[in-house]
Amino acid sequence: IGVESRSDPLGNLVAHFPGYGPRVMLFTHMDQLGFIVRKIEVDGLIRLERLGGVPERALAAQDVLICVGEGQDVSGVIANKSHHATTALEKYQVTPYAELYVDTGLSCAAEVEAAGIRIGAAVVYAPQAAALNDDRICGTSVDDRAGCAVLLEVARSLKNRTSGPPVDIAFTVLEEFNLRGALPLAQKLLPDIAIQLDLMLATDTPDMEARGEMVLGGGPGMSLYSFHGRGTLNGVIPHPAMVDLFERAATAENIPLQRSAQVGVLTDLSYVQLVGEGVASVDMGFPMRYSHSARELCDLGDLVSLAQLLLAALGQIGPKFSLNRDDYT
């Protein structure tokens, strides 16, 4: 899109758009969850270690891609025990990932190694995407390639603007691994405001309806509360200036803005918010179904509206924009 960018030693990619007022870091992660090759058996079957929060109950019989180099990646399938040999008890059990293995069709360890597969090789869900109806996309790594698509459209618009705050648009790494890839970049940029883009758990399916009111196709979402609660005592409660900003921008642009409050959800913003003397922060995003599975689902209209909302909000941040909490009580 003709925008100058740079990368840091971790692999974060950032583009700076100069301006006046509070400095804004607008970011989303570009990495994806997956696996690492842990062991190659004598018979050529491959054992995996988990990289990120992969759902074990959705792994058996999934197509995967073992990443060994451009044009040389090896396809495989996570094996599923033959149904005819499955006991009545096993039919209702989830096999732990450590007991699963990948079958590449290669017949021995020597053939696997000759294909370039080594311990430590990355393994991902086999990339795929399909249009459902006219306006929905189902595929791998919608989390957070959809967020990347939104930021590309925002960057395309910022390239031609004539006013507004200084904005650093960043595509970050290591979010699915340890949530800290964005941290060194934030320490370098020292933003006043941080806006993070990621999925919002859609709650419009029977298994999720008790979790909230986030509807696919209902517009972008704003998180009012997130807390991991699974060993990582971290989360984000947004700065009141950010809540006020996005509510005003949504009203002005007639964009429906959905609200989320979830336990079990965590983003890298939870660490970015603690940089320096503290950063005024908010998690924004798009509704998505079936998170961390091989097929995630989002609505294109939500992505378009999210890009429009971000641009509208940035347009309201001027040199006198207040981050004083007393102004929002």
Each PLM stretch: what is its role?
Residues 1-329:
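N-terminal hydrophobic/helix-forming segments and targeting peptides
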